[in-house]
Amino acid sequence: MWGKILGAFFGFLLGGPFGLLLGLFLGHKFDKARRNVYRGGGFGGFGTNRANSEERQAEFFYAGFAVMGHMAKAKGHVTEEEIRVASAIMDRMNLHGEARRQAQNAFREGKEDGFPLEETLAKVRQNCAGRADLLQFFLELQIQAAFADGSLHQNERQLLHVIARSLGFSERQLEQRLHMQEAAFRFQQGGFNQQHGGGFNQAPTRDQLADAYEVLGVTESATSQEVKRAYRKQMNEHHPDKLAAKGLPPEMMEIANQKAQELQAAYDMIRKEKGFK
């Protein structure tokens, strides 16, 4: 229902009566997709020629928060901290009004016992076939949610292995991303945003440098050329414009922008420390 209301409202604002009809249609598709996932039917029409990009984006958005809700329950029950973490992620995405309510509803449905996790992930993988960077974004979103409280519970780790395997990632690939996200969490706590915006007024500590290297996926012994290659690879995989062109929902673009800023800050810190351009 909410999909139709939101679609009609924005459709009318953007396109008058015709836009209203189109908005109603797309909103109906969103509502139908959400019901199909929750009832165990998976993403109906996902990956087919009939499925338009708006529907796929809506389904990706729904799945992201529904799986996040399932992740929050991995410890056995959902605490106020998990709810706070989900709200913080919504804040990072600048979600307000109806978009935020849709995310909250998806998160809530993912917590329920009957949520079809593996069917949902299989359809996400099907829809993103040939778009490895979108699958990586989806996995990293769940890793960020798991790490957002500063620790990773064993049950969360086990569930992340299920998610990664379902999306086509190996255990080694997951563990690498877990290490990188743990470093990214520390890097964020160290205030890289303020440092990046202010031009690094103070020399970074040894720990900050170590985290910066790990954010890029290289060791401290890496040469300048290796650092540059790692940076270009990471930016190529996480560039917001490229992700948008491949179907990343607009609501999730802010997360992609923040990741790109994080990579840039880590690279700048290492570049200045090593003294290369």
From Swiss-Prot:
Pfam families: DnaJ, TerB. The chain crosses the membrane at residues 5-28. Residues 211-277 form the J domain. It is a single-pass type III membrane protein. Residues 1-4 are periplasmic. GO terms for cellular component: plasma membrane. InterPro entries: DjlA (IPR023749), DjlA_DnaK_co-chaperone (IPR050817), DjlA_N (IPR007791), DnaJ_domain (IPR001623), J_dom_sf (IPR036869), TerB-like (IPR029024). Regulatory DnaK co-chaperone. Direct interaction between DnaK and DjlA is needed for the induction of the wcaABCDE operon, involved in the synthesis of a colanic acid polysaccharide capsule, possibly through activation of the RcsB/RcsC phosphotransfer signaling pathway. The colanic acid capsule may help the bacterium survive conditions outside the host. PANTHER family: CO-CHAPERONE PROTEIN DJLA (PTHR24074). This is Co-chaperone protein DjlA. It comes from Photobacterium profundum (strain SS9). The lineage of its organism: Bacteria, Pseudomonadati, Pseudomonadota, Gammaproteobacteria, Vibrionales. The gene is djlA.
